[in-house]
Swiss-Prot record:
Pfam families: LpxB. One of its GO terms (molecular function) is phospholipid binding. This is Lipid-A-disaccharide synthase. GO terms for biological process: lipid A biosynthetic process. The keyword Cell membrane does not apply. It comes from Xanthomonas euvesicatoria pv. vesicatoria (strain 85-10).
Length: 439
């Protein structure tokens, strides 16, 4: 899920332990006591975690920090990266060992991954943790959670799979594996409640980290752009397959926009060196002026902050664009066979794809999918934002309301829920409202 917790100096700030961030006077206070929660442990709590990718590593670090406020002598072990190690987690394996993507790569590494999973669960069982927390990575974590739960260890799954979008019955299987599910979005706990699974809405860490009023001027200064520049950010995805399907289409759309806005600057953040090479090849094939096309190393949030409008692939980046309050156009394509199968079997249960639209239950951003994701149609949608600042202004309060809904001091709420499980409190199944309270 995913640049959760990404910080770019001078551009974003955060909120911890109830400190106010941003300038929205209607924002709800988030009081959380840093005092340890009393418990009856004969020894300090032992907490094992697995984070299988960079975003999970950052989530895990925030959770560990908050749990340590409640249990200063707690011990933390597991699979993680630099962020989790930085807050005192002893990692038996590095998170990079789980970072495989795509069916072919997964199949190639499957024997190693199965061996690693078996070794980890035997070692963690011998360590006798009080709770195990699997962070995202459901294909790896849920079997570990189920195996440990069968042996009497309390289990938590942090970051729900998208049960609201497709295969809702997965909620039942997740409940077999996890005693508690920690959800980033408010529409998720009611789905789990229908299946008898305890799930809590804790908020989204990205909403905690991004200021209510983001600073466009600072972002433009960081990138060497003037305040008067006309700027489009283009983000065709963070994976090779996404970029291969969307990049040329997006850059052709950007060129069409530049025909109407001759001084347009185009910002293209690359998630990693492999993506950068592919994006550079696509840019070289496009008709975009070299002097006004800026290929960046990372800096996706800075690029979105600096932009007037954002063109991006459907995914977590749409949430980030909403949180920095930028109008966007969302495009996406999947392999034609995959699309036909999904449509034929009716696997998708939502009629919107972009997270801001799903959260608002409204069409805040144009969505152009599959055959509709064509340069000409993308150009029309982008120009509509550039040429109608009144529409952009009307969008801001909608974005702000969604931001406030998600901004709940997620790490602290997640730690409270884990502490409740450890202490045997709030263990009954229930529906949890958008503020994270029992309905």
């Amino acid at each position: 899920m995913k640049e959760i917790g990404n910080r770019e100096s001078g551009i974003v700030d955060g909120q911890r332990n109830g400190a106010s961030v941003g300038s929205d006077p209607t924002a709800l206070p988030i009081p959380h006591s840093p005092l340890p929660i009393p418990g009856a442990h004969a020894r300090p709590p032992r907490i094992a975690l697995i984070a299988g990718e960079a975003s999970g590593d950052i989530l895990g670090a925030g959770l560990i920090e908050q749990l340590r406020l409640r249990y200063p002598n707690a011990e933390f072990v597991g699979i993680g990266g630099d962020a989790m190690r930085g807050v005192g987690c002893q990692t038996w394996f590095d998170a990079s060992e789980l970072a495989v993507m795509g069916l072919t790569e997964v199949l190639r590494h499957l024997p190693r991954l199965l061996k690693l999973r078996s070794a980890f669960r035997e070692r963690v069982l011998a360590w006798k943790p009080d709770v195990f927390i699997g962070i995202d990575a459901p294909d790896f974590n849920l079997p570990v959670e189920r195996w440990l739960k069968q042996r009497g260890i309390k289990t938590v799954h942090y970051v729900s799979p998208s049960v609201w979008a497709w295969r809702e019955k997965r909620a039942e299987k997740i409940g077999v594996s996890a005693d508690l599910v920690l959800c980033l979005f408010p529409m998720e706990p009611p789905i789990y409640a229908r299946h008898g699974v305890d799930a809590r809405f804790v908020g989204h860490p990205m909403a905690d980290d991004i200021a209510y009023q983001a600073d466009r001027a600072a972002a433009r200064a960081t990138l060497g752009l003037s305040a008067s520049s006309t700027v489009l950010a283009v983000l065709p995805g963070s994976r090779h397959g996404e970029i291969s399907r969307l990049g040329d289409t997006f850059f052709q759309a950007a060129w069409l926009v530049s025909e109407h806005l001759p001084n347009l600057h185009v910002l293209v953040p690359a998630a990693n060196p492999g993506c950068k090479q592919l994006l550079a090849e696509q840019l070289s094939r496009s008709s975009l002026p070299v002097m006004r096309s800026h290929l960046l190393d990372g800096q996706a949030r800075t690029a979105m902050l600096a932009a007037d409008v954002v063109l991006l692939a459907s995914g977590t980046a749409t949430l980030e664009a909403m949180l920095v309050k930028r109008p966007m156009v969302v495009g996406y394509k999947v392999a034609p066979l995959t699309y036909r199968i999904v449509k034929l079997l009716g696997l998708l249960k939502v009629n919107r794809y972009a997270l801001p639209n799903i959260l608002a239950n409204d069409d805040l951003a144009p969505e152009l999918m599959q055959d509709d994701c064509a340069p000409e149609r993308l150009c029309v949608a982008l120009l509509d934002w550039f040429k109608h600042p009144d529409k952009v202004a009307a969008l801001q309060p909608r974005y702000l309301a969604l931001h406030a809904q998600l901004r709940r001091d997620a790490s602290a709420r997640a730690a409270d829920a884990v502490a409740g499980l450890l202490e045997g409190r709030d263990s009954e199944v229930g529906i949890w409202d958008s503020a994270g309270a029992k309905a």
